[in-house]
Curated annotation (Swiss-Prot):
The keyword Metal-binding does not apply. Belongs to the V-ATPase e1/e2 subunit family. It comes from Saccharomyces cerevisiae (strain ATCC 204508 / S288c). Subunit of the V0 complex of vacuolar(H+)-ATPase (V-ATPase), a multisubunit enzyme composed of a peripheral complex (V1) that hydrolyzes ATP and a membrane integral complex (V0) that translocates protons. V-ATPase is responsible for acidifying and maintaining the pH of intracellular compartments. This is V-type proton ATPase subunit e. The gene is VMA9. V-ATPase is a heteromultimeric enzyme composed of a peripheral catalytic V1 complex (components A to H) attached to an integral membrane V0 proton pore complex (components: a, c, c', c'', d, e, f and VOA1). The keyword Transmembrane helix applies. One of its GO terms (molecular function) is ATPase-coupled ion transmembrane transporter activity. One of its GO terms (biological process) is protein-containing complex assembly. It is a multi-pass membrane protein.
Length: 73
């Protein structure tokens, strides 16, 4: 269950950073700055979460290739 809490925790941190940047964005080109930084944070979170969860719960179990055939499954 630690994977759920890790992903949710990182999501909360990224969301807080997005809200903070929404409030503190520079005044010139504010829409460009907001969309660039918030979309960057969102995409980085998605890539991290997908990679983290794929490594935590792989679809194909790893197999050892250095075993003798009689000990292999």
């Amino acid at each position: 269950m630690s994977s759920f809490y890790t992903v949710v925790g990182v999501f909360i941190v990224v969301s807080a950073m997005s809200v903070l940047f929404w409030i503190m964005a520079p005044k010139n080109n504010q829409a460009v700055w907001r969309s660039t930084v918030i979309l960057t944070l969102a995409m980085m979170f998605l890539m991290w979460a997908i990679t983290f969860l794929c490594q935590l719960h792989p679809l194909v179990a790893p197999r050892r290739s250095d075993l003798r055939p009689e000990f292999a499954e």
